[in-house]
UniProtKB/Swiss-Prot annotation:
This is Probable metalloprotease y4qB. Signal peptide: none annotated. InterPro entries: CAP3, JAB_dom_prok, MPN. It comes from Sinorhizobium fredii (strain NBRC 101917 / NGR234). GO terms for biological process: proteolysis. SUPFAM superfamilies: JAB1/MPN domain. It comes from the Bacteria. Zn(2+) binds at H89, H91, D103.
Length: 164
């Protein structure tokens, strides 16, 4: 069954604004939300990278301490309904919306992290530039490749927006 990600229009607008602000550098953030069923993720909030985030032409690393405090705060405010559900970041001037090797490694780390509690993290990549950012949505999951080896499988997802 196809994967679907619901995201508020206001979150998409905030992502595009941040992407255009840092257009030559990678930028990104964190998503809070929930899975309404096995194939439908609902994003309710985006947490930006924070003031101490590191942005370069080829990588983005959020301000982890600030990010975690915002995740904790939103979790409490939501009545413990919304949890960490994934991330987004830009690939400036990229032609392909496929997750990079680094993106797959990041997904593996998230999936294996007990603190994240995200066995199927969402990853949205904004590719292009200020005039033409194109979103590409993925769901990550570990699959067994052989008896002892695991690999990250990424499944494309459809993005639908909603008004809040």
């Amino acid at each position: 069954m196809p994967k679907l990600i619901w995201i508020p229009e206001s979150v998409v607008e905030a992502m595009l604004k941040d992407a255009s602000r840092w257009h030559d550098l990678e930028t990104g953030g964190t998503f809070m939300g929930y899975w309404s069923d096995a194939n439908v993720a609902v994003i309710t909030k985006m947490i930006d990278g924070g003031s101490e985030a590191i942005r370069t032409r080829k990588s983005f690393s959020p301000d982890r301490e600030w990010e975690q405090s915002e995740i904790d705060r939103h979790y409490r405010v939501s009545g413990r309904v919304d949890t960490y559900i994934g991330d987004w970041h830009t690939h400036p001037n990229a032609q392909s919306g496929e997750p990079s090797w680094t993106d797959r490694r990041c997904l593996r780390t998230i999936i294996r992290s007990p603190e994240a509690r995200a066995p199927r993290p969402v990853m949205i990549l904004l590719c292009g530039g200020p005039e033409n950012w194109l979103p590409h949505a993925w769901i990550g999951q570990l699959t067994r490749r052989a008896l002892l080896f695991e690999r990250v499988e990424t499944t494309a997802a459809t993005i639908s927006t909603y008004k809040t």
